[in-house]
Amino acid sequence: MKQIQIAIDGPASSGKSTVAKIIAKDFGYTYLDTGAMYRAATYLALRHHLTEEDATEIVDLLNNHSVSFGRAEDGEQLVFVGDVDVTHPIRENEVTNNVSWVSAIPQVREKLVALQQQIAAQGGIVMDGRDIGTVVLPQAELKIYLVASVEERAERRYKENLSKGIPADLEKLKEEIAERDYKDSHREVSPLRPADDAIHFDTTGIGISEVVAFIEEKAKKIIDK
């Protein structure tokens, strides 16, 4: 059966990762959470007290500490920096609030995009992020751009944080998400924007299963051509 590349882009907490994981599992494809890679880079930068002025040092850290993925017995995706499991630390608020400036560093993006493209070249893949359809996989057969209201996305992040034992303030999350939207869409390198041939889908008020079904139907039509 023909295998394709599925690119899912969108702003923070638009449902990208949740949807992408399910689709990858259903199709037997590789799932790559590119956001986790940038979070891992941010985690490294913060651990070493680096700032936006330290781009070269951050890239050096990435050269010396490989970012890789594993799978827990319950199916949860694990993220490693070197041999250290950073799955949960990279989801903490400090990382979340700093990932935009780290991911805007051209040398960091260049290194991680090259790694993402290497992984994608190995076969069927579902990849989610902010520049997958425009930069990482511009040739992807299916490109989806997910959006949702700031209020709904803040509510999702609020519930997710509480479930992981991370303190959360709903109003503050709304402010942080709106601020991150602005930063991500206005950065000079690979800004958040839909690919010209992406299918837009507003997930506000729509369940995950409906979003998955919509994307899988589009994918099957391409595969069956």
From Swiss-Prot:
It is found in: Cytoplasm. SUPFAM superfamilies: P-loop containing nucleoside triphosphate hydrolases. The gene is cmk. It catalyses: CMP + ATP = CDP + ADP; dCMP + ATP = dCDP + ADP. Keywords: ATP-binding, Cytoplasm, Kinase, Nucleotide-binding, Transferase. GO terms for cellular component: cytosol. Pfam families: Cytidylate_kin. It is an enzyme of class 2 (transferase). ATP binds at G10, P11, A12, S13, S14, G15, K16, S17, T18. Its EC number is 2.7.4.25. InterPro entries: Cytidylate_kin, Cytidylate_kinase_dom, P-loop_NTPase. Belongs to the cytidylate kinase family. Type 1 subfamily. GO terms for molecular function: ATP binding; CMP kinase activity; dCMP kinase activity. Its main location: cytoplasm. This is Cytidylate kinase. PANTHER family: CYTIDYLATE KINASE, CYTIDYLATE KINASE/PANTOATE-BETA-ALANINE LIGASE.
